[in-house]
Amino acid sequence: MIFWLMAMLLMFAATAQPKRAKADVKKEKELVGTFVPIPEQSFTMQDVLEDGTLGPKVEYNLPAFYMLETEVTNKAYNLFLNDLKAQGRTDDYEKARFRPENWSTIETVKWYQDPKSGKITCLSDTARYQYITSPTFELYPAVNVPYEGAVLFCQWLTEKVGNPEWEYALPSQLDWTWAAAGGKGDVYSMGGPFLRAADGTPYYHYLHVDDTWITRTDSGLHVVDLSNDKSVHLNMGFHIPYPAMSLRANGYGLYNMCGNVAEMVSNPNMAVGGSWLDPGYDIRIYSIKEYTQPSPQIGFRVIARKVKKEEIEGKK
């Protein structure tokens, strides 16, 4: 199920960005990748209610943080899993391990039904495991990951970097939304309302529905005809996500904030931004996907945030 929280970013004011230790940045890059700064912001948001009216204005102040420029990759997640095994943390490993069998959860999407055999396929059993283990896919986003695994990954990264003044976590929905907007108030992370450039080059990885199969009713409702196997095709023709660092970055230097894989946030069972299996309307910054199990459409990325002094004291 997908639903949307539409919001308007009305104003903002940025303040100072906390500095990072060079040793931390080096360790991060070795373990998971590069983090980019997301400045502190004060802004007002309004929900668009179900009846189309604007809800009350709410003031927010987000402290500055850093965000991983890509989704967490298979390479980074496998490093984490292998370290859990090396430490003998078998219970944590079982909680966090990939669930490649969940590729089957998208085989009910009739958009990929083979017109000759009638079979509905995405990846073969062998290919499902190759997506996890093959060097070909090591820089692709880690998917079919449990929420508990993503949380453990963040805790593991915090331990490995080892700076008590910083911690790694899943972003809140608000953190993620502001970072995805790249300092703008548009509905897509690259800015503006468009999914493709004027020459047809895609800005995002998403499920492209050919215009031929979209009609409008007398009441103005759009209807998509999925009865023909040629009516829908994936962007660039793939049946898997794309490399975590692909296409262009947004204004903050973040890749694939809309599309490719929907991303977990700190709120369990919620993923945002849409995926490679969602049509363009469902990969907006405010798109929300509910989930109850690991999914080939869902991955995650990590933020680094400064720990408050009183929190550090409390851990001693």
Locations of the language-model features?
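Bacterial Sec-dependent N-terminal signal peptides
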Residues: 1-20, 179
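Sec-dependent signal peptide cleavage junction
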Residues: 15-34, 98-99, 105, 309-316
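Functional-site microenvironments in short loops/helix caps that host divalent-cation chemistry
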Residues: 24, 44, 125-296, 311-315
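A short glycine-rich, aromatic-capped structural motif
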Residues: 28-117, 123, 141-148, 259
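Residues embedded in well-ordered beta-strands
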Residues: 36, 187, 299-301
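Residues within well-ordered beta-strands of beta-sheet-rich folds
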Residues: 66-71, 156, 301-303
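Phosphate/oxyanion-binding loops and surfaces in catalytic or ligand/nucleic-acid-binding neighborhoods
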Residues: 83-87, 186, 264, 305
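Short, structured beta-strand segments at or near domain termini in extracellular proteins/domains
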Residues: 298-309
